[in-house]
């Protein structure tokens, strides 16, 4: 899912329950005709829980009815389930834990890391200004794009911010 790396890179995650679809909100005064469905909210919540960075989950604009309360409980349960299944992956130089891929695209090298444990992907973002590096969560599709000489949008946005 394309949202997974975004959730994996978030410190704070908030869900506005008015973003749920009418059918999911169980309250015609809440919700949106094109809102997200409860399954997606639970999946996103689990991704947030699995993130090593996420330290806050907030649910906002709550409806006061029994069915909605059950949904909020499920969203929180999925977050806690994700926290329970967190894998601390931070030593990217450990060849026992990560595969390192260097891809040449349009005259620049992009370095990717893939966890041998979780099979999740990261890109190295080199910040030459302060001589430090950060690791940006990404998808295998970003790696495949780079192999086809297409610089991943995620990498471009991250390096533009640096």
Segments predicted by a language model, with ranges:
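Catalytic cores of soluble, metal-dependent hydrolases
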Residues: 1-162
């Amino acid at each position: 899912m394309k949202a997974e790396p975004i959730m994996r890179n978030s410190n704070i995650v908030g869900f506005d329950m008015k973003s749920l679809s009418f059918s999911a909100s169980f309250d015609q005064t809440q919700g949106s005709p094109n809102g997200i469905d409860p399954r997606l909210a639970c999946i996103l919540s689990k991704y947030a829980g699995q993130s090593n960075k996420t330290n806050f989950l907030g649910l906002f604009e709550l409806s006061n009815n029994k069915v909605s309360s059950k949904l909020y409980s499920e969203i929180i349960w999925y977050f806690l389930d994700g926290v329970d299944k967190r894998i601390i992956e931070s030593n990217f130089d450990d060849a026992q834990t990560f595969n390192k891929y260097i891809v040449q695209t349009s005259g620049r090298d992009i370095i990717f890391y893939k966890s041998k444990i979780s099979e999740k992907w990261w890109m190295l973002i080199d910040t030459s200004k302060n001589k430090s590096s950060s690791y940006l969560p990404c998808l295998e599709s970003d790696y495949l794009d780079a192999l086809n000489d297409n610089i991943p949008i995620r990498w471009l946005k991250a390096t533009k911010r640096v």
